[in-house]
């Protein structure tokens, strides 16, 4: 296209903190009976403590999730595109069910208190800043394994949760300051976490054992695994450096 503005809408009463397209993820593609509808859906979250599910072209949200009590920092759809996780300054993570089939014939805005979370994940003691779904469960490359969600918090920990039951599987306690970012490896076996303490920890998902650590020259702002067979992790740092770690021989 021409790069022109397709739509501009006022959805929130405070800063918009994150936005995610339903089908704009790196997981294995999931086909919907109404793919055109799925491609038009996106979610937003805000410092106004709400999460909106929106459809391109609609002037108002088609669904609002309003159970958090403080800023919502991050949102992520699961691999099956049937769940939405939200992380908040209220120290909780909510997992919301998505009934996309019910949206196929209706674009009517739903009342804010219409939907209860499937699970409220409690355990963090400070703000939860980042989320990541593992490549497990329905719609993933490992459908026989339970859905897993990782969360990063200013309480210096990350947690791995069973998203099917809401149970906390592991608490990762190796950081000395706020955990700012995290991501699972494509093979689903490892979780990388990055903190304000300049450290990257790579944890084995099965037992929460730290299998590799790296200390950079600044706070760790973002992490990204390669999607290629060679195991590499890109690390964005606050000291203006980008580091690529070759972990091919470090992870077993």
Role assignments for model-derived ranges:
Residues 10-16, 66-72, 114, 121-128, ...:
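WD40/WD-repeat beta-propeller blade N-cap
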Residues 1, 51-54, 75, 93-98, ...:
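WD40-repeat beta-propellers
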Residues 45-48, 86-90, 151-155, 193-197, ...:
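Conserved strand-to-loop turn within each blade of WD40 beta-propeller repeats
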Residues 5, 15, 38, 61, ...:
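WD40/WD-repeat beta-propeller blade-loop signature
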Residues 97-109, 247-252:
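Short loop/turn segments immediately following beta-strands, especially the blade-tip
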Residues 3-4, 59, 101, 115, ...:
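Short coil/turn linkers that define WD40 beta-propeller blade boundaries
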């Amino acid at each position: 296209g021409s790069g022109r503005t397709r739509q501009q809408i006022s959805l929130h009463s405070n800063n918009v903190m994150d936005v995610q397209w339903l089908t704009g993820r790196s997981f294995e593609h999931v086909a919907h009976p109404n793919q055109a509808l799925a491609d038009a859906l996106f979610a937003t979250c805000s410092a106004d403590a709400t999460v909106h599910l929106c459809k391109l072209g609609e002037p108002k949200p088609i669904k609002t999730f309003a159970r958090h009590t403080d800023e919502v920092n991050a949102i992520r759809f699961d691999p099956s595109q049937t769940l939405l996780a939200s992380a908040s300054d209220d120290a909780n993570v909510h997992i919301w069910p998505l009934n996309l089939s019910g949206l196929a014939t209706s674009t009517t805005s739903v009342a804010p208190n219409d939907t209860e979370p499937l699970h409220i994940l409690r355990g963090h003691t400070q703000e939860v800043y980042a989320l990541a779904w593992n490549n497990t469960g329905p719609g993933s490359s490992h459908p026989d394994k339970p859905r897993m969600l990782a969360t990063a918090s200013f309480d210096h920990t990350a947690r791995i949760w069973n998203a099917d039951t809401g149970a906390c599987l592991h608490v990762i306690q190796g950081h000395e300051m706020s955990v700012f970012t995290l991501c699972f490896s494509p093979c689903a076996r490892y979780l990388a976490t990055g903190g304000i303490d300049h450290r990257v920890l790579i944890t084995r998902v099965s037992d929460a054992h730290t299998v590799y650590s790296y200390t950079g020259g600044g706070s760790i702002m973002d992490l990204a695994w390669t999607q290629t067979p060679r195991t590499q992790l890109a690390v964005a740092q606050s000291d203006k450096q980008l580091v690529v770690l070759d972990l091919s021989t470090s992870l077993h």
